[in-house]
Amino acid sequence: MTDNLVIYHLHSDNSLLDSCTGYKLYIDRAAELGQPAIAFSEHGKPLNWVKKKMYCDEKGIKYIHGVEIYLTESLNEKVRDNYHTVLIARNEQGVKELNLAVSKSCDKDHFYYVNRLSFDEFLKLSNNIITTSACLASPLNKLPVDHPMYESLVKRYDFLEIQSHDCQEQRDFNVHLAELAKKYSKPLIAGTDTHSLDKYKAECRKILLKYKNKSYGDEDTYDLTYKSREELDAAFARQGVLPPELYRQAMDNTLVMADMVEPFELDASIKYPILYGSSEEDSRIETERVDRMFKEKLEAGIIPPEQEKGFRSALTEERRVFEKLGMSGFMLCMSELICWCKENNIPIGPGRGSVGGSRTAFVTDIIECNPEQWHTVFSRFCNEDRKEIGD
């Protein structure tokens, strides 16, 4: 079964406590409907995007990287205008640019209740970012049409987003967007502003909003559940303000937008630091460091003579594993960092987690607990078959 629709304006429980639906439930539903792609537009930040992409890949659905960003007229004035706009990465470079823009929006001079970009910063985004005008909190709805930035904003949007909510403000905005689309030759696109998987999850969200003491005006008249093409078509028909050929073309344009997005591969491999130019050089320096500090601890009696043999055997094996996994630079980095902290009177803890099984970590002052004394196990921290980074 194939459903000719892509849901791209979508909020999971990552969206500032504004949803009770986990991202996997949405992706499962998209796969069930046969929808070819899905995008998440979480409020302000593309949280958990790596996990979302990996799960989309697992389900055979195209992942589209997006966010619903907050815009402000000026960063100089502390005003909670917080206009909404959806950003979608067109390609891998767009993913990096989108993430960088979100990071910038979190800077101290940008943040005011929420992370924000200025209108000027938004307009300077490259064509690697696809933009839609978002919901009723869009600047195209909240600003007067004679605002000096209004026309520039309209021209920057790649798509003007109509939605099917059955309230007068949305009806009026849809008509206005259709007029703007005609005037500026901009395509309409059908957004859903999905916040819940189904009616049950929508009720859960109502309870959550009550708990937060939040109310969003006419939202009781909205249906923010996940839609199939047939369901969204029926919702626009009930709304009754746009001709069918217009809103159906807007639904088709969700597929057009998805086709504009280039798929990209995610390198989820573990990446350890290289401190001195190459893994081989890091390994050589780490070996010298371990040998020197081991000798110092033996001479100081920190490592008792009866433990020397066990330590030597363990250090040799750990060195082999670290070199095979490319971890020498990581261990060297941690040792140098912690020793520097101690030399500069910066408090650190005695160590935690499975690293307590590493004799190398003890010898190089990463931890203070002697693994040989307490018979802790190195393989719990690191072994050739472990896929995750040890803690």
Each language-model region and where it sits:
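Domain-core and long-helix interface of multi-subunit machines
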Residues: 1-40, 44-59, 100-199, 245-247, ...
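Non-catalytic structural connector segments
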Residues: 1-6, 242-354, 362-367
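Hydrophobic or amphipathic alpha-helical targeting/insertion segments
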Residues: 45-111
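Histidine/acidic-residue-rich catalytic or RNA/ligand-binding cores of hydrolases
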Residues: 171-174, 198-209, 361-362
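Conserved, well-ordered active-site substructure
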Residues: 203-216, 367-368
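Enzymes and membrane/adaptor proteins characterized by extended Gly/Ser/Thr/Asp/Glu-rich
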Residues: 210-211, 218-242
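A structural-propensity feature for long, helix-poor, extended segments
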Residues: 232, 236, 240, 382-391
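Class I SAM-dependent methyltransferase SAM-binding "motif I" and its flanking Rossmann-like core
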Residues: 361-389
